[in-house]
């Protein structure tokens, strides 16, 4: 874990059978789910660990419509830190990325510079 706050974006399919969205274990070693992981980053960054759903995105062209929910953890964060989860509803481990996926990620990165 870094000493200073950091902006974190996690993108995870809810139907991921390789790394389960809800968490599970690999060969007897437990790992946290997507929400718990992002909440841990939010806590590290001093953010309130209650996220806010702020909209939807179309990240997976193999799924109909704007299937992905954006949850942001930005309240009360220390400078230079935040956490965000893009949950791809019914998305698997390797989504069929939409044509504008790269643009969305680059916009996110540029919008969250390290101070």
Regions found by a protein language model. Give the residues of each.
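Conserved beta-strand scaffold positions in the cores of enzyme catalytic domains, especially
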Residues: 70-72, 83-87
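The feature captures the conserved acid-bearing segment of alpha/beta-hydrolase catalytic domains
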Residues: 1-64, 72-79
